[in-house]
Regions:
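Membrane-proximal, non-transmembrane alpha-helical segments
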Residues: 428-481
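Single conserved hydrophobic/aromatic residue that forms the stacking wall/gate
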Residues: 1-9, 13
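TM-lumen/periplasm interface segments of multi-pass membrane proteins
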Residues: 100-185, 452-459
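Short, Lys/Arg-enriched, Gly/Pro-containing loop segments at transmembrane-helix junctions
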Residues: 48-58, 561-572
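Helix-boundary/low-complexity linker signature
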Residues: 11, 577-579
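Cytosolic nucleotide-binding catalytic cores of signal-transduction proteins
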Residues: 582
Length: 582
């Protein structure tokens, strides 16, 4: 079926110009009017919000000269909660517009993974790519796609669960119906960035009472991280990684809000549902994110218990809602994982063995015999799964290879192999650590340029340049850091002294750590040496957020200690003149 924009000959009713076009224009006009009215109300409330007494920047009434210069004057500026949120919001909007609105902006390049996502969310190549197939693969940024059906209501529910990108994609389709044209990943990027910004601003608002002035630098650091070009490229693409930062940030924001709100609040019903939606976004971003399901269930169960009502009937209803949310998230996550098994499982297993384990084995012949692989397949060692079929002894999808390889070599077979060969496993783990030092620029480029591997980016790379300072270069360093952090969090959780909010935040830290740690071995053990840096994306994202959180906690603890020491020194200095006079 030829696909052009949103029109197809297979769906004549849906493209009838006498029905759809006028309806689209009518809805578009109504949306514009509603947007103007809503915008006016929001702007008015924002101005009132920022003009109230508590939200102003309290400037001390003194001149710069009288206070010892401009620096001393600026130190006396008191930043409020609403002012902090407003500054972080302005910085986020400025970063997004600066990097995505120019004609030359960053985007993702198809490395072969787009097809899997396009099939799941019902997207197809637009006419220019159909006319020239060379532009479909590692050519450059492609932002315009076509689709047959405007909406898929079943895929938005547990009836037909699919990748979580389906949710923002439906909003993009609706906008496309109103404006005409193709499905645009640039519009998709702005929608995803809006969700990330909303989560970040909610975090800044909720954490201000705990962190005070530290909230602003922490919020700006996270903004520079998630809105840098290395992360923006994923939003403007059809990679599975697109929804991971969205789901993770929404999960963190909802968890912090639930942890800090009064226990048993009526609003906890709504926020439990929002938390379930957030973890669903995270666990179904791509198939391998199913490993985050245990952490998601822990969060849902803990807050179901923590916020349970005291009355009997509301308690039963709240408990049933928590159980239902856990069941739906689990069902959708496992459903998405099962869907993906038939799509890429064979290629993944191939690369794990021939492009990974056998390449580092001291005796490849013995390793092949141990894994039950025929000796005639030895020439395939070192080949990834995307060469032409003529390059292999047996084609990747052939029945012969199914019988000789796939029928008895599975992911669990490879796990057992590495457990029997700890030296090889350590080699692969160290490889993963080396790949996690820098954020990769593979499979991303600017819209006006042809793709070249690891092309340098030139707009917003502050976080990319800084993160190599605290990234480990060996596996044992990660074991030491994460082991120490895990023991510290468990101590906080099981000690009686800390407040319950502190215990809940420590549990969140452990859950984010779990999500990242579970992705660490998959990058190399589960995919060999193929796209290691891309496969480490989730781990690096979790690691970066954990580093910022740990840094804020450390500074927060050092500030009271420093003040206590200064007060002790001051008191000691005051006592000395008194002793001399006596």
């Amino acid at each position: 079926v030829a696909v052009t924009g949103v029109q197809t000959c297979a769906l004549p009713i849906c493209i009838d110009l006498l029905t759809v076009k006028p309806l689209a224009f009518l809805l578009g006009g109504l949306m514009v009017l509603v947007s103007f009215a809503s915008g006016a109300v929001v702007l008015r409330r924002l101005m009132v919000w920022l003009s109230v007494k508590d939200a102003k920047l309290a400037l001390p009434p003194c001149s710069a000269g009288a206070s010892g210069g401009l620096l001393a004057y600026l130190r006396k500026i008191r930043m409020t909660q609403k002012g902090t949120v407003a500054i972080v919001a302005l910085v986020c909007v400025a970063l997004c517009c600066w990097q995505l609105l120019p004609a030359e902006h960053i985007g993702g390049v198809n490395n072969g993974d787009f097809g899997r996502m396009m099939e799941q969310i019902d997207l197809y190549w637009a006419q220019p790519q159909l006319d020239d197939e060379s532009t479909q693969f590692e050519w450059g940024v492609v932002e315009d796609f076509s689709y047959r059906e405007p909406f898929h209501p079943a895929r938005l529910t547990s009836i037909d669960p699919t990748y979580s990108l389906i949710f923002p994609s439906m909003l993009v389709r609706f906008i496309t119906l109103l404006t005409g044209g193709h499905y645009s990943t640039q519009v998709q990027a702005f929608i995803l960035l809006s969700l990330v910004m909303a989560a970040l601003l909610l975090l800044v608002h909720d954490l201000y009472p705990l962190l005070g002035k530290l909230t602003l630098p922490a919020g700006l650091i996270v903004a520079c991280m998630l809105l840098g070009e290395n992360y923006l490229a994923w939003y403007n693409s059809l990679f599975g990684e697109t929804m991971i930062p969205v789901g993770l940030m929404l999960t963190i924001a909802c968890t912090v809000h639930l942890a800090l709100m009064p226990r048993g609040s009526r609003k906890s019903w709504l926020w439990m549902i929002l938390l379930a939606i957030s973890v669903r976004f995270l666990c179904t971003a791509k198939a391998q994110m199913a490993l985050a399901l245990p952490a998601a269930l822990v969060l849902l169960i803990v807050f179901t218990v923590y916020h349970h009502p005291q009355a009997k009937k509301p308690l039963i209803a709240f408990s049933l809602m928590g159980a239902l949310l856990c069941g739906l998230v689990s069902y959708d996550t496992l459903g998405v994982y099962r869907k993906n098994q038939g799509v890429s499982e064979k290629q993944t297993i191939w690369q794990s063995v021939f492009y990974g384990a056998l390449m580092i084995a001291d005796d490849p012949d013995a390793a092949m015999e141990e894994l039950g692989i025929p000796a005639e397949m030895k020439p395939d060692i070192g080949k990834h799964a995307y060469y032409p079929n003529s390059e292999y002894v047996y084609p990747i999808e052939s029945d012969e290879l199914q019988e000789k390889f796939y029928d008895h070599v599975t992911t669990m077979t490879l796990v057992r192999y590495y457990l029997r060969h700890p030296k090889d496993m350590l080699t692969m783990m160290n490889r993963a650590a080396q790949e996690s030092v820098t954020l990769s620029t593979s499979f991303m480029t600017y819209t006006d340029a042809r793709y070249s591997d690891n092309r340098p980016l030139h707009r917003m790379n502050l976080w990319c340049n800084l993160r190599s300072i605290f990234a480990a270069r060996a596996f044992w360093v990660y074991v030491l850091l994460y082991g120490t952090a895990g023991v510290f969090c468990l101590t906080l959780i099981f000690r009686k002294k800390p407040q319950k909010q502190t215990k809940l935040l420590a549990m969140l830290f452990l859950c984010v750590m779990f999500v990242g740690v579970m992705q660490y071995p998959l990058s190399v053990i589960g995919n060999g040496f193929a796209d290691n840096n891309k496969q480490m994306y989730t781990f690096m994202l979790c690691h970066d957020l954990l580093v910022v959180a740990a840094g804020v906690v450390l500074v927060r603890r050092l500030i009271p200690a420093r003040r206590t020491a200064e007060n002790a020194i001051r008191e000691e200095a005051d006592h000395e003149p008194q002793e001399e006079s006596a």
